[in-house]
Amino acid sequence: MKIFYSLIVVFALISNLAFAGVSKKEKKALIGLYNSTNGKHWVKKWDLKTPVAEWHGVKVVDDKVVEINLFRNNLMGSLPRDIANLENLTVLNLAFNAITGVLPRELSELKNLRVLKLEMNRIKGEIPEEIGNLISLEELSVFNNFLSGSIPNSIGNIKNLKILNLSSNHLKGTIPNSLGALTKLETLGLFENTLEGAIPGEMGNLRNLKELVLANNQFNGEIPMELGQLASLEIFQIQNNQFNSFKNLEMLETREFLVFDYDKNDRKIEFKDINLEKTRMADTKFEDIDK
């Protein structure tokens, strides 16, 4: 008889585990996102009566929500604060939608987040200083929104960042020196803001940088000689700024150059070791590239 009852208990435990699903807290957070972004009008809607693992764009591993990919899905409205309850999230891709409102500070509580893609939305307000708490982040892309204020110094704390794209917003102020600590960075996009001042010499620490786009801002002064250390650079766009000297660019290692766009300033830049057969150089006021 004891064996019989033991088998019943074991069977019950196995059944509970098999049908446990995601936690109530995570499911509630997902429903909050659905409701706050007008889920009934999404292109691909969620059937809230079905298991979470079956919801479009949601990846569940071991009963934990680890990815949300709702790219180009007609999300409208703001991001809810309880999105922080998705504590196992590693990827959040809500790009190419019509999300409004501000970036909730609670986003910074997603300590496992590796990818945050919110580009091509209508998000306004400042980038919260708490963004620097996302220490696992490898990609932060918020280009083409209505973000204002300055670039937070705390971004320099996100040491694993490889892609940082803040282009086409209303950001102002200077590039914080702290960005020089992002030594794993491969892409930095600050195009089309109202950023000003000189490029900090600390940028020369970004030895893995392949793409640096600073065009269409109000940067001034001379290009710092420290940029000569960026031997991996392939794309460098600095046109439509107010630089008064490009002399230090002649120190730039250019063996990997594919694209270089600048304002001519009545002066030809003599690069060393440049391969003119593979490099596009344009002394133009503006030339966009399709990647």
Model-found features: residue ranges?
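Bacterial Sec-dependent N-terminal signal peptides
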Residues: 1-24
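LRR flanking "cap" motifs
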Residues: 35-78, 291
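Leucine-rich repeat
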Residues: 62, 84-89, 108-113, 132-137, ...
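Consensus "Asn ladder" position of solenoid repeat domains
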Residues: 73, 97, 118-121, 142-145, ...
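The feature encodes a structural signal of leucine-rich repeats
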Residues: 79-81, 103-105, 124-129, 148-153, ...
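A generic tandem-repeat structural signature
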Residues: 86-168
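Eukaryotic tandem repeat interaction scaffolds
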Residues: 135-225
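Leucine-rich repeat domain C-terminal region
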Residues: 206, 210-221, 226-290
